[in-house]
Amino acid sequence: MQEVKAFNEKRAEIYWWFSSLFAKELTENELETYHSVEIRSFLAGLGENESLKPAVDTLVDALNRLQDREDAQLELAADFCELFLKTEKHGALPYASMYIGKSGLLNDKPAEEMEKLMADFGMQVDENLKEPADHLAVELDFLGNMIIRSNELEQEKHMEEALEKQNEFIQQHLMTWLPQFAAKCKQFDEFGFYVSVAQLLIAFCKLDSTYLLGE
C-alpha cells in the first residue's frame, strides 16, 4: 500500500502540473523555471518511459526553441490567448462541452456532470479560475484531488475500488474529448508548445490507464 500511495502522490503532482499549464498563461518567472535543471530533470524522467518519450521530446524541443524566441513570455501568452480564450472557429477551446456536448456550446451536459461529480466529492471550481466545471484545468485538478484523497484509504480492497474510479474518470471525462482537443491545438498552435503539452497529456492518460487496469 505504501508503494501505491507514494506513486499516487507522483501521479497527482503530474496531473496538477498539466492543470496549471491549461489554467493560465505562464509568467516570466514560471517560464524561467522551465529552463531549470529541476524541470528538465522532471521531463527527462518522464521521457524514460517509451510511451511518453516522443511527446516529451517534442515538448523539450518547443522549450528549447522558446529560449531563442524574442519576447518569449509575451508570445507564449498570446498563443495561450489565441488558442484557449478566443473562438471555437480559430482555436482549441479547453471545455469538454465543445467536443462531446450536444449543443456545441459552453456549459452543456459535460459541465453539469462535472459540477455534480465535484459536489459529491465536496469540491467546487476555484473562484480564481472563473471557468465552467468541464474546463480541462478543472478536470485535471479534480483528478489530482481524487488520487490524493484515495491515499487516506487503509484497506487494499478500497484502494482498488478508488483506482478503478480514477480510470473511469480518465476514460469518461478526459479521453472522450482530449484527442479532438489536441487535434485542434495542432491545427492552430503554430509555435507548438501547447500542442506538445496536449499530446503529452494524452500519452500520460493512456499510460496511467494501463497502470490502473493492472496491465
Swiss-Prot record:
Gene3D superfamilies: 1.20.120.1820, HscB, C-terminal domain. GO terms for biological process: protein complex oligomerization; protein folding. Its main location: cytoplasm. Keywords: Chaperone, Cytoplasm. It comes from the Bacteria. GO terms for cellular component: cytoplasm. The keyword Lipid metabolism does not apply. It is found in: Cytoplasm. InterPro entries: Chaperone_TorD, DMSO/NO3_reduct_chaperone, HscB_C_sf, TorD-like_sf, TorD/DmsD_chaperones. Involved in the biogenesis of TorA. Acts on TorA before the insertion of the molybdenum cofactor and, as a result, probably favors a conformation of the apoenzyme that is competent for acquiring the cofactor. HAMAP family: TorD (MF_01150). Belongs to the TorD/DmsD family. TorD subfamily. This is Chaperone protein TorD. It comes from Vibrio campbellii (strain ATCC BAA-1116).
